[in-house]
Amino acid sequence: MEPSFAPYAAHSSQTRGRVHREAPAAPRSEFQRDRDRIIHSTAFRRLEYKTQVFVNHEGDLFRTRLTHSIEVAQIGRTIARLLNLNEDLVEAVALAHDLGHTPFGHAGQDALNACMREHGGFEHNLQSLRVVDLLEERYAEFDGLNLTFEAREGILKHCALSNAEKLGEVGRRFIDKKQPSLEAQVANLADEIAYNNHDVDDGLRSGLITLEQLSEVTIFGRHLAEVRRKHPTLQGRRVVTETVRRIINALILDLVDTTRTNVVNSGVETLDDVRNAPPLAAFSPAILEQHRELKRFLLHHLYRHYKVARMSTKAGRIISDLYAAFTGDARLLPPEHQARESLEGTRAVADYIAGMTDRYAMREHRRIYAVEEIYD
């Protein structure tokens, strides 16, 4: 039995269903079932060894795609509860949103997209959908995880029109310029809250950015000053974690207040109303600008730091080399991927590379290109 949600929330009892029909899984709701399938998937476990910003072996305490996804789910559930939305759907979308991400973060994605430019490109959101629709191999009756329509549309955050046209119903909203459920919108913004603030935390831990630099950023400086005023003797990591905690809380509360106002002003009463309205989940204009200022700071001072740039260059080289090797000679692929390559060509190669963890990609690169490992 589902809790009582807002009338415009997504109710699993009213789901638009799964591609392959299945009997109900009582006592779980359909969205709980989605979440459980995602958690038990191979792709979800691989996220433990996929980069957020820093390559996994650079340090044990830096975030990975797995810890990031868990943090997004936690933030998303908090927002959903405050807005009386379906927490299970928000959690499912949050946990699955990065399943299609390449090794080495955005550097890996950019490199693979460049390799696939003449073959449809590579979008990690589209790849996440491909993972849950096709690539996971767990069930006797179907490929993929056979998730509900609502979970699948939430995973597909962005999609080029050329690709949307090939996806049928789940890609239709990009063509019709409609919105996904509020739960999907919340999961998207929870992702932004999580990665900005946790990249701040990891950036400070790495020493690539400093508190002094961040104090010039409006939203961080304001909360840092509050922490120092309230806890004048606080030192070290506790200053950072207390500041980041306060920023996350402030962003959540602003998002909830602004979204509530948007819902009231728009007059939405049903999920269909949500789909036909402008985006409803949002930050206030003032907080949105402060959030963007923080993103700009991270872009210039962390993501473009020369040490991160060096890691990104190496990562791009590994991905490009692997793609060249596998498309140049399919015999270098493992047997099961050779079979898929003979049917799907370069897309099967992209699937194989995108599914690698950071360390597996580095190992495969050494096996193919390092002459000292000729017998590996």
Curated annotation (Swiss-Prot):
Keyword terms of this UniProt record: Hydrolase
Lineage: Bacteria, Pseudomonadati, Pseudomonadota, Betaproteobacteria, Nitrosomonadales
InterPro entries: dGTPase, dGTPase-like, dNTPase_2, HD/PDEase_dom, HD_domain, PHydrolase_assoc_dom
SUPFAM superfamilies: HD-domain/PDEase-like (SSF109604)
Highest taxon in the source lineage: Bacteria
Keyword check for DNA repair: no
Protein's name in the database: Deoxyguanosinetriphosphate triphosphohydrolase-like protein
Region ranges (Disordered): 1-32
Family membership noted in the UniProt record: Belongs to the dGTPase family. Type 2 subfamily.
Pfam family, one: HD
GO BP term (any one): dGTP catabolic process
Record carries keyword Hydrolase: yes
GO molecular function per UniProt: dGTPase activity
Domain called HD: residue spans: 65-196
